[in-house]
Amino acid sequence: MKILPLDPSDQAVVAIPARIGSTRLPRKVLLEINGKPMLHHVIERSQKAELVTKVFVITDNEEVFESVGPTGAKALMSDPECSSGTARIASVIDQLPGGIIINVQADQPVVEPKLIDGIIQKLVNTEADISTPIWQIQTTEQLSDASVVKVVCGHQG
């Protein structure tokens, strides 16, 4: 992928909403994978994206907040009443620098840095206000699985 330079006003940051209260897998963002919390893997992969200037973790939990310290990311506290990760990011939007904010979920320990860069490039090079990576559903099980997010696209994607 060809990386184009960003205008300073287009600074891109990754915002990782992280909550501890998962119902299907409690405390999942702090569960260890290869000796470190899942959240740390997400942070490290996000930091490897060439166009990302800073990574933020937004949480309402003190333990998650404290765990961010050694990673080089910055932790921000959000309102515990936020109903979604997007709402969590919106609650601290004034504390996030830059013109581009990429929402990376805290349970994506193998997120590809090139995917993050591709989203940033798409936002810089088009008039799009938002970009969401999607994948085609591969099985009928995925189609009926409530935990698999579905997206309906128009003719232009």
For the regions a language model picked out, list residue spans one by one.
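Residue-level preference for the first positions of well-ordered beta-strands
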Residues: 11-13, 100, 130
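Residues at the C-termini of beta-strands that transition into short coil/loop
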Residues: 34, 79, 134
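Short phosphate-binding loop-to-helix
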Residues: 56, 62-121
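Short beta-strand segments
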Residues: 17, 103-105, 133-136
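Conserved core of the sugar-phosphate nucleotidyltransferase
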Residues: 112-157
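Short, high-confidence coil segments that cap the C-terminus of an alpha-helix
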Residues: 52, 98, 125-129
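N-terminal glycine-rich phosphate-binding loop and ensuing alpha1 helix
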Residues: 3-59
